[in-house]
A protein has these predicted regions:
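A short, proline-enriched helix->beta-strand linker immediately N-terminal to the Walker B motif
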Residues: 180-184
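P-loop NTP-binding/switch modules centered on Walker-like glycine-rich loops
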Residues: 187-191, 195-277
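ABC ATPase nucleotide-binding domain helical subdomain, centered on the C-loop/LSGGQ "ABC signature"
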Residues: 136-151, 158-159, 254, 262-266
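Charged, flexible cofactor/metal-binding loops and thiol motifs
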Residues: 81-82, 248-335
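Conserved ABC ATPase signature
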Residues: 160-165, 169
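ABC ATPase NBD Q-loop/coupling interface
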Residues: 72-96
Length: 335
């Protein structure tokens, strides 16, 4: 763990479970990481691995049939230390933090915007609640945010409803809403999924400006390893509710020591290697969340697995900044 002065958010042994029909889905099962001020932590992994649930837990936006079973979520606000997991989900203190100090860009813009209010109203609502701006200043700021997101004719679009926006424009409106109050922590869940590459570059540049100008800490959830290589300072690889490997971007991308990390990297085509390059898909699929394998969750899909993998490995420090949860990490590191 880093010095607390450099940490914006610290998650320690977090466990978030879902309960349905007398069954329990351990969606997040003992996750620990730090997000440093002015740095980007990229969280990668297949769908269903617990990335979005981790983000929703930090924001206290979990559904009714879910519970934080154990762990801490510590938000370092100036000189104050706030345990988010102890706050009421819709209590006054959590509402003050959410959207202002910690903001989130949601994965699905189609359902995140309210269809009965204009897009401008929904962005302005955040500014009205969390700032001292007057109506004219709020409107100017809202138009400026839409302009920065590359939305054409923002003076007109600000008064239009979500159905008038394309999918990509709705995504950009959601990003504008999240960036409105210059948050201390920005959680971005697949923020550029519906956007073309030029707009993606523009959005990532804006996120970079937040880091540079306001020392914002960013948690970026993505499947795109190219984005990870370009933007990440630190990387956490998740699989079935656990972080299986974490470290600096250089550690994880250049020296992967968990078979899942290596499999993810091997499954991505590399520009410049030509059409005959060997791309290796990950065999099998993620297990049923209600019928998990014993021990290492990746073992049924792993080429290195043996009997030792019937017991979940402890976290091992490869270096001061590089951690892995695997019995076979030495073999993989040498491979």
């Amino acid at each position: 763990m880093e010095n607390n002065k450099n940490i914006a958010l610290s998650v320690k042994d977090l466990k978030t479970y879902f309960y349905t029909n007398n069954r329990c889905n351990k969606a997040v099962n003992g996750v620990s990481f730090d997000i440093e001020k002015g740095k980007t932590l990229c969280v990668v992994g297949e769908s269903g691995c617990g990335k979005s649930v981790t983000a929703s837990t930090i924001m206290q936006l979990l559904p009714t049939l879910s519970r934080i079973e154990e762990g801490e979520i510590i938000f370092y606000k100036d000189e104050e230390k706030i345990n988010i997991e102890k706050l009421e989900r819709n209590g006054k203190q959590m509402r003050e933090i959410r959207g202002s100090d910690i903001a989130m860009i949601f994965q699905d813009p189609m359902t995140a915007l309210n269809p009965v209010y204009t897009v401008g109203f929904q962005i302005a609502e955040n500014l009205q609640y969390h700032t001292d701006m007057n109506k004219e200043e709020i409107r100017e700021k809202t138009i400026s945010l839409l302009h920065d997101m590359g939305i054409p004719l923002p003076e007109i679009r600000v008064d239009e409803y979500p159905h008038s926006y394309s999918g990509g424009m709705r995504q950009r409106a959601m990003i504008a809403m999240a960036m409105a109050c210059n948050p201390k922590i920005l959680i971005a869940d697949e923020p550029t999924t519906a956007l073309d590459v030029t707009i993606q570059a523009q959005i990532f540049e804006l996120m970079g400006n937040l880091k540079k100008n306001f020392n914002t800490a960013i948690m970026l959830i993505t499947h795109d390893m190219g984005v990870v290589a370009e933007l990440a300072d630190n990387v956490a690889v998740m699989y079935m509710g656990n972080i299986v490997e974490s470290g600096t971007a250089d550690d994880v991308l250049r020296r992967p020591t968990h078979p899942y990390t290596k499999a993810l990297l091997d499954s991505v085509p590399v520009l410049g290697r030509g059409r005959n390059q060997d791309i290796k898909p990950i065999k099998g699929s993620t297990p049923d969340a209600y019928d998990r394998p014993v021990g290492c969750q990746f073992a049924p899909r792993c080429n290195w697995a043996d009997e030792s993998c019937n017991v979940m490995a402890e976290i091992t420090n490869i270096t001061a900044s590089h951690e892995v949860r695997c019995h076979k990490y030495k073999e993989i590191f040498q491979y």
